[in-house]
Amino acid sequence: TICLNMIVKNESHIIKKTLTNIIKYVRLDYWVICDTGSTDNTVNIITSFFNELNIPGEIHNHEWKDFAHNRNLSLDLAYGKSDYLFIFDADDEIHGSFKIPSLTKDSYMVLFGGGYSYKRTSIINNRKKWKYFGVLHEVIVGQEEMTESMVITGEYHFVSGRTGSRNMNINKYTEDAQLLEDTFYKT
């Protein structure tokens, strides 16, 4: 079974398109999404979307702190509710002929393309504990003994979007720099 796991905030302008894109490629059995303070219609769009498809799930509300903190809350809330978690950002998209293989490993990386290419862990074994580290550009790490990871190959790529709410903030880079500086001096 696969559970969609996301954190969102003020994504009403893109969230239905994102969820429709996911459903085209991934058979979801459950979903756990954490909203970090939306003031728009994001939560209603999400719940209506999944209600129409009869896919059960949960929406939770948590105050925003940083990426690792909020992603970890989302992971904890989804723990054990499926065999695997499919982790996705609200403004990302899947292109091509993406197919999830038979899931036997503890983690799977997907290919991101566009101006340059890279891999990101996006599917994890939900019977094991995981933790994100990093206030920005966070990384997920298994917290117990893990089997090997696998890169899902094929004629597809994910696109890391730039249309989410956070990217609309003209002060994003200044705020990110301040957050990194503050975090540096705390350690």
Enumerate the language-model features and the residues they cover.
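Cell-envelope/extracellular polymer assembly enzymes that use nucleotide-activated donors
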Residues: 1-3, 30
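Aromatic-flanked redox-active Cys/Sec active sites in thiol-based oxidoreductases
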Residues: 8-9, 36
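Short, well-formed alpha-helical segments that are part of the catalytic scaffolds
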Residues: 10-26, 30
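A conserved acidic beta->alpha catalytic loop
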Residues: 21, 33-46, 50, 63-64
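Short acidic donor-binding/metal-coordinating loop in glycosyltransferase active sites
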Residues: 36, 62, 82, 88-92
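Short helix-capping segments at alpha-helix termini
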Residues: 50-56
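Catalytic-site signature of metal-activated, phosphate-bearing donor transferases
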Residues: 68-76, 86-88, 92-187
